[in-house]
Amino acid sequence: QSAVSIQIKKLESTLGLQLIERNSKNFKLTFAGKELFKMSQDVFEKISRMENEMKKILQYKKGKISIGATHNIGEPVLPRIMVEFRKQYPEIEFDLYIKNKESLVKHLKEGTVDIALMEEYFIEDKEIKVIETEDYPFVVVAGKEITNLDELQNIPLLKRDTILTNKYLDLFEKIVGFNLDKRISVNGSIETMKNLIKDGLGFAILPYYSVHEEVERGALKLVHKFEKSEDRFQIVLIRENEDKEGISKFVEFLENYKINRDNAPLVTKVKKTKK
């Protein structure tokens, strides 16, 4: 018998429950075994978080926060957030991770990431706390050479396949009064889409937070700003960590941070040609 089998039998004897159904060829977990496995996963995740926290303290002699974000938030927004956070809290050190949503949740539970910023994402986990931020608007942006809405009929729509993009696309077609049949699907990041627009390959419907700097500089032209804002960020963290000093300060900073930048000057919207 292997050492593992011996330990499992000892555990079964201690609990008074059969954890594994055995036969000559294979085995499977009993109901009790499956429940114990689920609970043990939580224990291992907590141990992993503890080990990662101790490594940070050992390496930096003080607390250090690890901040994660999805690509669509991390590339256009996170650098600006961290510059302003550093001005307010220069003593707090941090690491940054740019991952997809699933990876961020995994790293949160393992303790390699303390806080994650992501688009709305359903998370059903009692250990995880989700804080909703302010709403932010979507806009239509094009290259700086565009002077009226009718010109959009001649260039492709660069389209991200998301529910909100499809919704705002339908609304925009009603506003301009013609169908946007020329389309290019783009599976890359928002930064990729912005570069394609700058190079004159099309226009796009994007969150305003991701393009407002280019609009201010005149690198992109604001074609239309939708009046209703209904999408938002999520600040995601492990509940047991929310009172740690560096984490609580960063969360408070994010809750007060104005992503929309409503006071930022906008380029005058282009008009639809009168007929």
Go through each PLM region and give its residues.
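A short LG(V/I)-centered, amphipathic sequence patch enriched
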Residues: 12-31
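Alpha-helical linker/hinge and terminal dimerization helices associated
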Residues: 14-15, 36-58
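Central regulatory/effector-binding core of bacterial HTH transcription factors
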Residues: 62-123
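Hydrophobic hinge/microswitch elements
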Residues: 100-105, 109-112, 178-223, 227-229
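Flexible hinge/capping segments at coil-to-helix
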Residues: 128-166
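Secondary-structure junction motif
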Residues: 156-179, 244, 251, 260-270
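A late-sequence structural motif
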Residues: 223-265
